[in-house]
Regions:
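Hydrophobic transmembrane alpha-helices and their immediate loop junctions
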Residues: 1-178
Length: 178
Protein backbone atom coordinates (compact mmCIF):
# COMPACT_ATOMS: atom_id res chain seq x y z
CA UNK A 1 0.00 0.00 0.00
CA UNK A 2 2.85 2.40 0.80
CA UNK A 3 4.50 1.90 -2.59
CA UNK A 4 1.21 2.46 -4.40
CA UNK A 5 0.69 5.73 -2.53
CA UNK A 6 4.26 6.77 -3.33
CA UNK A 7 3.88 5.93 -7.02
CA UNK A 8 0.52 7.72 -7.32
CA UNK A 9 1.80 10.84 -5.62
CA UNK A 10 4.99 10.90 -7.69
CA UNK A 11 3.11 10.50 -10.96
CA UNK A 12 0.64 13.25 -10.07
CA UNK A 13 3.53 15.51 -9.01
CA UNK A 14 5.22 15.04 -12.37
CA UNK A 15 1.99 15.47 -14.35
CA UNK A 16 1.16 18.68 -12.50
CA UNK A 17 4.66 20.06 -13.06
CA UNK A 18 4.58 19.25 -16.78
CA UNK A 19 1.13 20.82 -17.12
CA UNK A 20 2.32 24.07 -15.53
CA UNK A 21 5.66 24.11 -17.36
CA UNK A 22 4.26 23.45 -20.83
CA UNK A 23 1.26 25.73 -20.36
CA UNK A 24 3.73 28.56 -19.80
CA UNK A 25 5.70 27.54 -22.92
CA UNK A 26 2.57 27.23 -25.04
CA UNK A 27 1.44 30.73 -24.04
CA UNK A 28 4.87 32.18 -24.91
CA UNK A 29 4.97 30.42 -28.28
CA UNK A 30 1.41 31.43 -29.18
CA UNK A 31 1.96 35.07 -28.29
CA UNK A 32 5.33 35.24 -30.04
CA UNK A 33 3.60 33.86 -33.13
CA UNK A 34 0.96 36.59 -32.85
CA UNK A 35 3.73 39.19 -32.98
CA UNK A 36 5.22 37.49 -36.04
CA UNK A 37 8.37 36.29 -34.29
CA UNK A 38 9.98 33.05 -35.42
CA UNK A 39 10.23 30.67 -32.48
CA UNK A 40 11.51 27.21 -31.82
CA UNK A 41 11.43 25.11 -28.71
CA UNK A 42 12.70 21.92 -27.21
CA UNK A 43 11.69 20.13 -24.04
CA UNK A 44 13.17 22.78 -21.76
CA UNK A 45 13.13 26.22 -23.36
CA UNK A 46 11.79 28.49 -26.07
CA UNK A 47 14.12 29.98 -28.68
CA UNK A 48 13.33 33.29 -30.39
CA UNK A 49 14.95 33.65 -33.81
CA UNK A 50 14.94 37.43 -33.98
CA UNK A 51 17.48 40.19 -33.53
CA UNK A 52 17.54 42.03 -30.23
CA UNK A 53 16.50 45.32 -31.87
CA UNK A 54 13.29 43.69 -33.20
CA UNK A 55 11.80 43.31 -29.72
CA UNK A 56 9.14 45.88 -28.82
CA UNK A 57 8.04 46.93 -25.36
CA UNK A 58 4.56 45.55 -25.88
CA UNK A 59 5.85 42.21 -27.17
CA UNK A 60 8.21 41.70 -24.24
CA UNK A 61 5.60 42.66 -21.67
CA UNK A 62 2.92 40.45 -23.18
CA UNK A 63 5.03 37.41 -24.09
CA UNK A 64 6.84 37.19 -20.77
CA UNK A 65 3.97 38.13 -18.45
CA UNK A 66 1.02 36.27 -19.99
CA UNK A 67 2.41 32.84 -19.04
CA UNK A 68 2.71 33.57 -15.30
CA UNK A 69 -0.71 35.25 -15.29
CA UNK A 70 -2.29 32.21 -16.96
CA UNK A 71 -0.47 29.93 -14.51
CA UNK A 72 -1.86 31.96 -11.60
CA UNK A 73 -5.38 31.54 -13.00
CA UNK A 74 -4.82 27.81 -13.51
CA UNK A 75 -3.52 27.43 -9.94
CA UNK A 76 -6.46 29.36 -8.53
CA UNK A 77 -8.93 27.21 -10.47
CA UNK A 78 -7.18 24.05 -9.25
CA UNK A 79 -7.43 25.28 -5.65
CA UNK A 80 -11.13 26.08 -6.08
CA UNK A 81 -11.69 22.63 -7.57
CA UNK A 82 -9.80 21.08 -4.64
CA UNK A 83 -12.13 22.77 -2.15
CA UNK A 84 -15.06 21.36 -4.13
CA UNK A 85 -13.70 17.82 -3.64
CA UNK A 86 -12.32 18.30 -0.11
CA UNK A 87 -14.77 15.94 1.62
CA UNK A 88 -14.63 13.29 -1.09
CA UNK A 89 -12.07 10.48 -0.99
CA UNK A 90 -11.23 11.22 -4.64
CA UNK A 91 -7.61 10.90 -5.76
CA UNK A 92 -8.04 13.86 -8.12
CA UNK A 93 -7.44 16.05 -5.05
CA UNK A 94 -3.78 15.08 -5.07
CA UNK A 95 -3.40 16.27 -8.67
CA UNK A 96 -5.25 19.50 -7.90
CA UNK A 97 -3.04 20.17 -4.87
CA UNK A 98 0.12 19.64 -6.91
CA UNK A 99 -1.16 21.86 -9.74
CA UNK A 100 -1.92 24.70 -7.36
CA UNK A 101 1.38 24.31 -5.49
CA UNK A 102 3.41 24.24 -8.71
CA UNK A 103 1.46 27.18 -10.12
CA UNK A 104 1.93 29.41 -7.09
CA UNK A 105 5.59 28.42 -6.73
CA UNK A 106 6.13 29.08 -10.44
CA UNK A 107 4.57 32.53 -10.26
CA UNK A 108 6.12 33.78 -7.04
CA UNK A 109 9.44 32.06 -7.67
CA UNK A 110 9.74 33.65 -11.09
CA UNK A 111 8.82 37.03 -9.62
CA UNK A 112 11.61 36.65 -7.09
CA UNK A 113 14.37 34.85 -9.01
CA UNK A 114 13.50 36.05 -12.51
CA UNK A 115 13.56 39.63 -11.36
CA UNK A 116 16.93 39.31 -9.66
CA UNK A 117 18.64 37.40 -12.52
CA UNK A 118 16.74 39.16 -15.36
CA UNK A 119 15.23 35.94 -16.71
CA UNK A 120 11.66 35.07 -17.70
CA UNK A 121 9.19 37.48 -16.18
CA UNK A 122 12.17 39.57 -15.04
CA UNK A 123 12.47 40.83 -18.63
CA UNK A 124 9.15 42.61 -18.15
CA UNK A 125 10.51 44.64 -15.27
CA UNK A 126 13.69 45.46 -17.20
CA UNK A 127 11.66 46.72 -20.15
CA UNK A 128 9.52 48.78 -17.78
CA UNK A 129 12.76 50.54 -16.72
CA UNK A 130 12.10 50.01 -13.05
CA UNK A 131 14.75 51.15 -10.63
CA UNK A 132 16.74 48.62 -8.65
CA UNK A 133 14.72 49.50 -5.56
CA UNK A 134 11.44 48.78 -7.34
CA UNK A 135 12.84 45.50 -8.68
CA UNK A 136 13.90 44.52 -5.16
CA UNK A 137 10.40 45.28 -3.88
CA UNK A 138 8.94 43.03 -6.60
CA UNK A 139 11.43 40.31 -5.62
CA UNK A 140 10.41 40.69 -1.97
CA UNK A 141 6.74 40.44 -3.00
CA UNK A 142 7.64 37.17 -4.71
CA UNK A 143 9.30 35.96 -1.51
CA UNK A 144 6.29 36.96 0.58
CA UNK A 145 4.10 35.17 -1.97
CA UNK A 146 6.15 32.00 -1.53
CA UNK A 147 5.78 32.24 2.24
CA UNK A 148 2.06 32.90 1.84
CA UNK A 149 1.76 29.87 -0.44
CA UNK A 150 3.42 27.68 2.17
CA UNK A 151 1.11 28.99 4.88
CA UNK A 152 -2.05 28.83 2.79
CA UNK A 153 -1.43 25.40 1.30
CA UNK A 154 -0.56 23.64 4.57
CA UNK A 155 -4.21 23.03 5.42
CA UNK A 156 -5.23 21.69 1.97
CA UNK A 157 -2.22 19.35 1.99
CA UNK A 158 -3.25 17.99 5.38
CA UNK A 159 -6.86 17.65 4.22
CA UNK A 160 -5.77 15.69 1.16
CA UNK A 161 -4.82 12.79 3.45
CA UNK A 162 -8.32 11.36 3.15
CA UNK A 163 -7.53 10.44 -0.46
CA UNK A 164 -5.61 7.45 0.87
CA UNK A 165 -6.47 7.14 4.57
CA UNK A 166 -9.90 7.06 6.17
CA UNK A 167 -8.43 8.43 9.36
CA UNK A 168 -5.06 10.09 9.87
CA UNK A 169 -3.45 8.71 13.02
CA UNK A 170 0.02 8.49 14.55
CA UNK A 171 0.48 5.08 12.95
CA UNK A 172 -0.13 6.15 9.35
CA UNK A 173 1.00 9.81 9.55
CA UNK A 174 4.62 9.05 8.50
CA UNK A 175 3.30 7.35 5.35
CA UNK A 176 1.27 10.44 4.51
CA UNK A 177 4.26 12.77 4.88
CA UNK A 178 6.48 10.70 2.59
Amino acid sequence: NFWLITLNSTVTYILAYLLIFYTNHFIKIALAGNFGYDVGFNHSQVFYYIESHEWTHDAVKLIYSAGPIMILILGGLALIAFWHFVQEPARIKILLIWISLHAFNFLFGSLMIGNIFKEGVGHVFNWMYLTDTAKMIVALLGFVGLLGTAYTMSKPVALSANSYFNQLSERNFPFFIT
